């Protein structure tokens, strides 16, 4: 019996965030593709030559330092993950905490995580 699209979507909806990340990685590996968003074509002319200020950032946890429990709490607060998912994410450092966030949110999250004892990078 073949699964319908609705069956697959319902199964994915019941998965945890970490399970979905693992599923995406497995699909990328199996089919030889990436889940990256295609970049929009660049505008031509001298205006395009001007350096653009980056407006979206990825908040990456480089390490959790000495205060792992505090970092896990900060990650849970920022992402809404459950305790186990947040712990697994922190322990898998370097790991992306949030992707495609604006500069203000990225800076605020970086500050909170660093106050909790983590080493954080903005990319």
Curated annotation (Swiss-Prot):
Function statement: Forms part of the ribosomal stalk which helps the ribosome interact with GTP-bound translation factors. Is thus essential for accurate translation.
UniProt KW Ribonucleoprotein keyword: yes
Matching CDD domains: Ribosomal_L7_L12
Family assignment from sequence similarity: Belongs to the bacterial ribosomal protein bL12 family.
Leader peptide range in chain numbering: none
Species for this entry: Psychrobacter arcticus (strain DSM 17307 / VKM B-2377 / 273-4)
MF term (GO), any: mRNA binding
Name of the gene: rplL
Any Pfam family matching the protein: Ribosomal_L12
Gene Ontology, cellular component aspect: cytosolic large ribosomal subunit
GO annotation, biological process: translation
Gene3D superfamilies: 3.30.1390.10, Single helix bin (1.20.5.710)
Quaternary data: Homodimer. Part of the ribosomal stalk of the 50S ribosomal subunit. Forms a multimeric L10(L12)X complex, where L10 forms an elongated spine to which 2 to 4 L12 dimers bind in a sequential fashion. Binds GTP-bound translation factors.
Designated name of the protein: Large ribosomal subunit protein bL12
Keyword annotations: Ribonucleoprotein, Ribosomal protein
